[in-house]
Structures are given as C-alpha cells and as structure tokens.
Amino acid sequence: HLKGATALVTGANGFIGSHLVDQLLASGCTVHGLVRESSNLKWLDASKVHLHRVDLAQPDFIVPALEELDYVFHCAGLTKAKSRAGYFQVNATACSNLYEQCQKNGSRIKGIVHLSSLAATGPSPQGSLVDEITPCKPVTFYGQSKLAGEEIASQYSQSLPLSVIRPPVVYGPREENFFTFIKLIQKGWELQIGRAGKELSLIYVSDLVEAMLAASDPSKQKGRSYFVTDGHVYVWEQIAKECARIMNVQVKTLRVPE
C-alpha cells in the first residue's frame, strides 16, 4: 500500500524516525520529514527526503505539504524536558495542532500512525502483564504527557484514520540509551537501578517500523491502540548476562536506589 505514496514523518532525524524513513524510501514512497532547526541530520540523506524545519514546541507551527500526503507517521516526541509543561507542549499539545491541520487540509490521508510509549500505561505489577485494555497509570511526567497525546489522538480518530502504537524498550543501530547500558557492561559494570528482577519487554527497531507500516494500511481497523513487542519477557540481569557473554567480559553489579 506504500509504493508510489507520499508520507510525512515527524521526528524524521531521530532513532526510530530515521529507520522509518529508510524503510519508506525502500518501499517506493516520497518522504517528507519534519526536523528542528537544531536537529542532527547525520542519519538522513537530504537528497532523498524533503526536509522541513518545524518546531513542534511552537504553538503556531504549520505542517507542510498536507494536500500531498497519503500517510502521516508522528514519531516526534520529547523524552527529556526541564518541566512538566515542556513535556506536555511537545508530547500532547502539539498533537492537537498536528491532527487539526490533518483534519482540515489532509483530504488524501489514508492512514496516520501515532507513536506513543509503554510509559503511557505505567509499570505493570511484578509478574503481571498489561494489555491494551489495562487502565493507564503513568508515573512520570513523560508517561503522563504521552498518555495525554494518546487521548488527543483518540479524539481525532473519530474523523481521521488513526492508530496508536505503544512500543516498550526499543533497541538497534543509532539508539543511545540502551547502547550506554551495553557500553557500561563492556567496561565491566552492570548498572542495576532499584530492585533486582525487574521485568521488561523489548522490540528491535526494524520490527517496530514493520508494525508501524502495517498499522498504516488502510485495510486495517483504525482508532485502536497496539502494544508491539518481540513476544518475550526479559529481566535486566538476564540482558546484562547475555551481553557480557557475547563480549566475553566479567562484570560487577553496581546497585543504585530507584
């Protein structure tokens, strides 16, 4: 459904956004990318992507090329901010502006994918799983702002072909936070924050991109939220042990209170 289509990716220069751009181009799409004035574009080929400098933190930002778009992938988001208001401006309020413009001027749009986060749901009880109908109880400003963004997306899904994707920890080339964890192990340290045995889900970035492209398919049901994982449950100690085995290093555990 993507060959010959035109797609917009917000946060196109980011870890997930840049991988999505690569796959859209490989699928035969014309791609427009929203980036900030200060964005590092090292993972984007400016000769293949129509780049637009747009600051989603500004309340009056304008979405370019809306009349041409078949698909919109909203990947832009703020994972670190100085205040609660900073998170909410980009992760929630900006969604309202984006989808309002899509509603008014995006008459060709066949699919919108809103990239949220497992943080919008909040942590699961130890030993338990969460699913799409589990009540959301985010515990951080980031998670609360992502949930607010989801709620805005849900309102617009009444009139727009919109789906929400909630990834867990995403890993792969170009990622920095998970890579920092691995680099510490390479140096002989396993950083353990809080209690031992913390469970988590993972997804490889190319698998997440595949799920996002599938969710954009016009034949798929819209107005829904989806968790996407690799289907396994991990604990951090298990991941650290496997990383240490692959790199053939001995590690010491450094415990930090949560």
Task: Identify the meaning behind each predicted range.
Residues 122, 163-180:
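Flexible, glycine-rich beta-alpha linker
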